[in-house]
Amino acid sequence: VHKIILTDIDGVVLDWQTHFNDYLDKYYPGQELFDPTVFAQGEETGKIIREFNNTAWIGFLKPWKDSVEVLTEFKENGWHIFGCTSMGTDQYANSLRKKNIENLMPDVFARVDIIPFMEPKGHWLSQWRGSGAIWVEDKWSNAILGADMGIRTFLMKQSYNSNHDYKGVEKIDNWRQIYNKVTQ
């Protein structure tokens, strides 16, 4: 078994949405975000998300559910964990993002790659084709990209993504469910 985990960050490892909603309440009262993985909500929402991703707020996200506990356990059991987030390429925001992850989970990630804002993850995932890795994501289009490459794919269920089904995409509620499925 190749012990490789590929994971998105926001909505999977870190609780981006709660922190973003706190930011909205403070700076944009009355604004709402329904699905952080698409911009059908309008140009203004996309602009606010990009702005948020480049503020100091991005360095202080809390963990998503049981991510710290279970990813640490994976690491202790010899798994190599690689993250990919499409939060944008501001060097200072990226540094804060990496520090946030490292502060919550010291030495758990082998690497965190940060790609341009909202860029699909197909190119990043393609380097892992045939590796036996697993892929964890909350955005449907990126989950499908992984599944179509033959990468075992888990979709972290959220209010905005759990009403779809796709061959090769397994829906899960938390990291413990993934751990139990891949270590049995």
State what each model feature region is.
Residues 58, 62, 67-101:
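Substrate-recognition element of Asp-dependent hydrolases with the DxDx(T/V) motif
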Residues 122-129, 176-184:
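Short amphipathic alpha-helix with an adjacent loop that forms part of the alpha/beta core around
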Residues 71-75, 129, 143, 147:
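Surface-exposed amphipathic alpha-helices with a cationic face
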Residues 134-173:
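Acidic, Mg2+-coordinating phosphoryl-transfer loop and its flanking beta/alpha structural elements
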Residues 113-117, 168-177, 181:
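Short acidic-hydrophobic, aromatic-tinged amphipathic segments that line or gate anion-handling sites
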Residues 1-50:
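Active-site neighborhood of HAD-like aspartate-dependent phosphohydrolases
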Residues 84-134, 140, 144:
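Substrate-recognition "cap/lid" segment bordering the active-site pocket of phosphatases
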